[in-house]
Amino acid sequence: ILNDTLWKIHPSQVVVDSGRVDVNNFYFSHQDRYVRINGRLSENPKDTVKVDLKDINMGYVFDIASISDDVNFEGDATGTAYASGVFKKPIMNTRLFIKNFSLNHGRLGELDIYGEWDNENRGIRLDASIQDISPSPSRVTGIIYPLKPESGLDLNIEANELNLKFLEHYMKSIANDIKGRGTGKVHFYGKFKGLNLDGAVMTDASMNFDILNTHFAVKDTIHLAPTGLTFNNIHISDMEGHSGRMNGYLHFQHFKNLNYRFEIQANNMLVMNTKESTDMPFYGTVYGTGNVLL
């Protein structure tokens, strides 16, 4: 049983002898998903093992490794991995196609990835493209460090209309229902428990601010830094099409301990739409014109 799913282990042959392991058709499956392993594991760089995957959920790998609750990759991986000299100085590479690749429950698209093991840095170097709604794919290059205590990542992302839903996980203390797309260059790096973003993204998105129960749409460039997001005179609108301008910041430390200051120049915008609640001393529907400070 793996992650509450029953897998079938098929008959196979595994022989351990004189510092080497010969694997003949080690095969386990669940419905049409499977992992199949053939080859030899040893210190000899000429001895190679081959791993074939079909529709294996990436979430299994991260759950087994107990990497972090702050980053959650999902998607069904199909492809082949090769490894040689495993017991001394491993050389490993893989080519995978991952359907419905997602980060923190935000679907990013179809991922085509080439990866290889970097012995010196104890990480997986990757070169990947993500195909979604844009004719031009998003590109991801860099390295993932799966082994503790270094576990983390260092990725350069060239986003083309990339789904921004994954940010909802980090902003859930103040906002929800994040919808939209981003285009730009971003550096995504740090330990899994302390991730950072750095770059600039042209954003066409909306989100709901919990305390106001109001959706705002943003169509402008947002600047990202390890300390937070900066908004420089960006164009915003409410869901009824009334527009305004916003300056301010959303500060955080590794997406935690959020604090913010927004200065909004509103033109008859819906700035609050709350109902009676024991959590708030006031409620109502408010349209505002002028300067608003949040």
Question: How should these model regions be labeled?
Answer:
Residues I1-K185, F192-Y287:
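Interface amphipathic segments
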Residues G290:
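Glycine/Thr-rich phosphate-binding loops that ligate phosphate moieties of nucleotide
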